Amino acid sequence: LDGLAATIGLIIFSIFTVLFHIHGQQAYAVLCVSVIGALVSFLYFNFNPARVFMGDTGSLVVGFLIAICTLKLFNLWFTSPVVSFGPSLTLATIFILIFDLTRVVFIRVSNGISPFKADRSHLHHMICRQQFGHRGGTFILAAFNILFIVLVLPLGKLRFITFLIFCFCVAILLINSK
């Protein structure tokens, strides 16, 4: 989808910038701000009529940077917790990515298909099939990403309850995905 990886990446790196700044990790905060600048510039040229495309390599780089920053944040939360809801907020920030990956792998493996075989069972393909289009699909997934982040802010201190709600939602969605 046009701008999907960049839009989700923009949301994730915005939250990560704040979290790294709270932890005093200015080098990582600057890295996140740099990626935000690159993604905003990319989005400017990616919307209709699109003149630049991210492709597989670009989305892999964005995903790699998200993974590195996520691991660093988890390391920070468990070595020097500054904010009590940090791990929950970090998970909520990347929830859409984790959920889509888990859902697709579950569907493929349960159908006896290799999890590495390409198909159209990802969330954005499902949304496009519902006649929302590329921009609509990007907006819906970005809105859900922001919704999960906003929901964790008041619930984040209740780690066990947040974890149970998360597991319940994932279980329901995995069951209904077939």
Predicted segments, located by residue:
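Alpha-helical transmembrane segments
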Residues: 3-130, 134-178
